[in-house]
Amino acid sequence: MYCGRYETIGETRGNSLNVFIGAAAGFVAAVALINSGLATSFYSTPVRAVPQVIVPSSLAASSQLPVVPKETNIQVNSAQILYPDSTVKGQERTITILGVCSFLSASLFYIWKQFGMKARTTKPADLQEVSGGRIWSLASTTGSNIGAGKTVRVATRKSPLAMWQAEFIQSELERLWPGITVELQPMSTRGDKILDSPLAKVGGKGLFVKELETALLENRSDIAVHSTKDVPMELPEGLVLGVICKRHDPCDAIVFPKGSNLKSLEDLPHGARVGTSSLRRQCQLLLKRPDLKFLELRGNVNTRLAKLDSGDYDAIILAAAGLKRLGFSDRVLPGETNIIDPNVMCPAAGQGALSIELRTNDPEIAALLEPLHHIPDAVTVACERAMNRRLNGGCQVPISGFAQLKDGQLRMEARVGSVTGKGPLIIQSKTFRLPWSGRTWPQLQKESEALGVEVADMLLADGAQAYLDEAYASRTLGWA
């Protein structure tokens, strides 16, 4: 898997299946065409009659044979008059009909599946359709519109990125359930208001979701839309992170001021000022570039970019998904040279994925959201969050985790670093086969979480606890 080119398993086999279905449909149609007699009528040909004639039994019995005048051109069917090589020509035509119909049907069906269906669900900023993993989806729609007349209240932060995400979910629900009403409820969270202190000192990432969760618990909202990496590992009783949407780019990007000639991390000059408040990003970059100077960076994406362009920093680190969703395509350089490889900077748990939080006792809302749950990405996110939860990871600790699912293999890699940047990264990974056939989402979730916990225990066995203790004893530093 490569950041910026995020792949979903099953797409290749799905394309092949589309072609096969189309070809089969064309073959069946061609057989029906031939059997109906239309094919032979289409290929009836003026021929010169020859004396060799099929004689009906009734005429043969009476010896009243029909006479065909010499040199007479008549319109005949190959099933009526037997002329030389008529059988061969009929076979050739039959094969031609079968081949042409199968090819055309397969081509048209493939084009419709690949482009016609996707054209109806294209979303802004290149975000792939949420329900793109149709073969894995939990959706069990039967044609009934359970959304008709239903109102869904969506709690969201007020930042441009948060609003984009909420509007995206709104459009998906309206597409899935005609007649549904989706109301957005923008809210200011404490995390949005406190911009002069590191979050580790004032409560961590939970400050971005607490007000939204309160609205859910008080039944003022039905769902809350989040950037999954900002959601705490432990949720309040009565709430569940029930939906993980199709994941976008999970990687980080190094962004340069407008007009800069820099193209990648390697191009940064010695001692460059890099804006990021993330301990996760800092400790990994320090191992590659110990000369860099990190400066505090807070605010929404637009604010951070404005600070960069004003000269406060030589570069800043942002999530690639946020840039792409907001349409800052000019900040992603040609060839995506400024997208940082996950081998250099392992992403945060859940980075790049939208998630939806809801009440555990609300089956009607859960049914409406079910088609948005993208199981392959839900599996990887569940694995990452389980690892982080096992380590009691919060914003004070430089923990990163990235799971990848490909060809039935689930691979999890996690890293823990020192908040001082002086010690080496502790890195552990493991891969195991995750069978899909006949498995339910709860079964897949349980096994993926078990892998996350196992990798976390491997980190602890390798000495990660010392780094964790160091981080929690040094909360005056930044946040991860």
Swiss-Prot record:
A GO molecular function held by the record: hydroxymethylbilane synthase activity
Name by which UniProt lists this protein: Porphobilinogen deaminase, chloroplastic
GO cellular component: chloroplast
Family: Belongs to the HMBS family.
Keyword Lipoprotein among record annotations: no
Naturally occurring in which organism (per UniProt): Euglena gracilis
Native organism taxonomy: Eukaryota, Discoba, Euglenozoa, Euglenida, Spirocuta
Subcellular location: Plastid, Chloroplast
Enzyme class: transferase
Residues recorded with modification S-(dipyrrolylmethanemethyl)cysteine: C395
Pathway(s) where this gene product acts: Porphyrin-containing compound metabolism; protoporphyrin-IX biosynthesis; coproporphyrinogen-III from 5-aminolevulinate: step 2/4; Porphyrin-containing compound metabolism; chlorophyll biosynthesis
One Pfam family of this chain: Porphobil_deamC
Function: Tetrapolymerization of the monopyrrole PBG into the hydroxymethylbilane pre-uroporphyrinogen in several discrete steps.
Remarks, miscellaneous: The porphobilinogen subunits are added to the dipyrromethane group.
Enzymatic reactions: 4 porphobilinogen + H2O = hydroxymethylbilane + 4 NH4(+)
Named cofactor requirement(s): dipyrromethane
Gene Ontology biological process terms from the UniProt entry: chlorophyll biosynthetic process; protoporphyrinogen IX biosynthetic process
Top-level taxon of origin: Eukaryota
